[in-house]
Amino acid sequence: MPRVKRGVTARARHKKVLKLAKGYYGARSRTYRVAVQAVTKAGQYAYRDRRQKKRQFRQLWIARINAASRQNGLSYSRFINGLKKASIEIDRKILADIAVFDKVVFATLVEKAKDALAK
């Protein structure tokens, strides 16, 4: 079996990792061994945070809707329940935008939710 010299593939792998680690601080961007660890950890954080991003935005929307609906005299859960009973299907992202940028429209939505709850 012939001898395999791996200089070319090893260099290519090192270049790939160091390119991914470009911009990192200190040895993390210069030393292959440390850069591999930094790039791997960065990938783990990126994977985890792509999932957490969805949860965090939903939390933010709910907090904004809750604050705006309480200003109009209704808790978040009763507001959402009222919208469902009034068969108004607006998702939380849009509700949060309305709550922040168009308070008059949001107030009318709260009134419709209150009317649906009263029935």
From Swiss-Prot:
The keyword Repeat does not apply. GO terms for biological process: ribosomal large subunit assembly; translation. GO terms for cellular component: ribonucleoprotein complex; ribosome. This is Large ribosomal subunit protein bL20. InterPro entries: Ribosomal_bL20, RIBOSOMAL_L20_CS, Ribosomal_protein_bL20_C. Gene3D superfamilies: 6.10.160.10, Ribosomal protein L20. NCBIfam families: rplT_bact. SUPFAM superfamilies: Ribosomal protein L20. HAMAP family: Ribosomal_bL20. Binds directly to 23S ribosomal RNA and is necessary for the in vitro assembly process of the 50S ribosomal subunit. It is not involved in the protein synthesizing functions of that subunit. It comes from Shewanella pealeana (strain ATCC 700345 / ANG-SQ1). It holds the Pfam family Ribosomal_L20. GO terms for molecular function: rRNA binding; structural constituent of ribosome. Belongs to the bacterial ribosomal protein bL20 family. The gene is rplT. Keywords: Ribonucleoprotein, Ribosomal protein, RNA-binding, rRNA-binding.
